[in-house]
Amino acid sequence: MKKHLRLAALLATTILVLSSCSTQKQVRLVLLPDIQTYSRLYPDILRSQTQWAVEHADSIDFVLQQGDMTDHNIDKEWAVAASTLNMMDDKVPYAFVMGNHDLGKNSNKRDSQLFNNYFPYAKYSIRGI
């Protein structure tokens, strides 16, 4: 998980540095942090947020979901998170990282099986993410 957090921090820092350069265009980044409550209790709000990003794709450079997609690492929450984030497929560039909630109630065991099922490496490695 530390590797993912470092990668997200590096990406955010790179974007901030590049956006501050006068020769670079402005970077328009949408952040989706801690969506676990939406995945668990308010999926319509999460779908609305993601639909907004899709509808404004021409004015968005990148969407970053910052972890904690689920609250309890269960199928029902992963299904909501995956179906919602997949709305952006081929419409707006996006990436995501796992958060501590995504690893289960006892995150010391680091159970990423459901994450791997809903966000398979084969699908996202093709996109270069």
Predicted regions and their residues:
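Polar/charged alpha-helical tracts
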Residues: 3, 55, 116-117
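Bacterial N-terminal signal peptides
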Residues: 9-17
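N-terminal active-site segment of His-dependent metallophosphoesterases
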Residues: 20-78
